[in-house]
């Protein structure tokens, strides 16, 4: 069965000629939404691990984390190329000398073919942009931005703590220096209709090189979990999620790389929706529905 969308796997094979694995690294960062600069409680859905439950051990230096991750991957695959992905918290929120050291350490490994940095659009000052531009001349650099929604009411609810205009200028600045932008969008935020979610996806699709579509997960020990357990909102059913996903893929321009169609929360922390824990079943159901509806990326893109 042919997937009629531009998946990350397709992009990686086109770009690097073979399968490439992403290694999640821990840069030992914090976030302005946690250290008191903008807030202390983080985004409403964010776990204590800073949404990096699968990242390596922060106590190890970068080279050690990469070696550890490679050993794990090589048990199940003969993959020879890797992407260094700095995942938890805000990975440009540290002194520039420190950032230069950890990012340079990561890309100095010969089998690391690209660097991916998850951060906030309000943490991309000129000094950071200068560093990223320099690194991008050595190996490709991607920047991942957690936009999540374009709707102000939802952005306030999730405590994103920056306006849409900040995302816009960050994507512009990154594109000016030749850096690929990957935008995260959450599907299933409380009080958002399907139309609202599609508006966010369309908007991101017009600004970004890649997109991660993420089901809203409720994780233990988050403020979102308190709201969920007190009955303030419901999570999406698998059928509703897949229905929304079908439309999301069709409204995305065909050149936008789809990095993720669901996302899997840490099973130990997951409170809802429990169906999302069975990743294999979810992906099979998505593929079946895509085939049934003959879903084609870009068909409804304007």
Regions found by a protein language model. Give the residues of each.
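Conserved C-terminal portion of the radical SAM core fold
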Residues: 165-223, 239-262
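N-terminal [4Fe-4S]-dependent radical SAM core
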Residues: 1-83
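Short amphipathic alpha-helices and their capping/turn segments at secondary-structure boundaries
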Residues: 69-73, 124-138, 169, 198-207, ...
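Hydrophobic faces of well-ordered beta-strands that scaffold small-molecule active sites
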Residues: 21-25, 82-84, 115-117, 141-145, ...
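Short, electropositive alpha-helical surface patch
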Residues: 100-104, 133, 193-209, 239, ...
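Acidic (Asp/Glu)-rich catalytic clusters
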Residues: 73-75, 102-110, 130-140, 172-176, ...
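Core AdoMet radical
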Residues: 49-69, 76-96, 111-124, 140-166, ...
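Auxiliary Fe-S-binding modules of radical SAM enzymes
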Residues: 2-10, 19-21, 217-302
């Amino acid at each position: 069965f042919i997937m009629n969308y531009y998946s990350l796997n397709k992009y990686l094979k086109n770009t690097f000629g073979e399968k490439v694995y992403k290694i999640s690294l821990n840069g030992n960062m914090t976030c302005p939404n946690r250290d008191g600069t903008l807030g202390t409680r983080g985004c409403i859905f964010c776990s204590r691990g800073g949404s990096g439950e699968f990242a390596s051990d922060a106590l190890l230096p970068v080279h050690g984390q990469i070696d550890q991750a490679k050993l794990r991957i090589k048990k199940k695959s003969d993959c020879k190329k890797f992407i260094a992905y700095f995942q938890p918290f805000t990975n440009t929120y540290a002194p520039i000398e420190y950032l230069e050291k950890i990012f340079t350490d990561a890309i100095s490994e010969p089998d690391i073919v690209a660097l991916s940095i998850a951060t906030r659009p309000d943490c991309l000052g000129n000094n950071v942009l200068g560093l990223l531009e320099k690194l991008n001349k050595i190996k490709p650099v991607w920047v991942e931005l957690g936009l999540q929604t374009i709707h102000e009411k939802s952005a306030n609810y999730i405590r994103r703590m920056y306006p849409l205009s900040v995302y816009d200028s960050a994507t512009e600045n990154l594109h000016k220096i030749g850096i690929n932008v990957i935008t995260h969008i959450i599907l299933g935020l409380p009080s958002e209709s399907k139309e609202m979610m599609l508006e966010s996806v369309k908007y991101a699709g017009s600004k970004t090189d890649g997109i991660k579509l993420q089901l809203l997960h409720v994780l233990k020990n988050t403020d979102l979990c308190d709201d969920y357990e007190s009955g303030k909102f419901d999570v999406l059913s698998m059928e509703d999620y897949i229905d929304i996903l079908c439309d999301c893929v069709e409204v995305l321009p065909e050149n936008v790389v789809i990095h993720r169609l669901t996302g899997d929360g840490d099973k130990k922390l997951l409170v809802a929706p429990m169906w999302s824990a069975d990743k294999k079943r979810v992906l099979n159901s998505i593929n079946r529905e895509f085939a049934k509806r003959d879903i084609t990326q870009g068909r409804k893109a304007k």
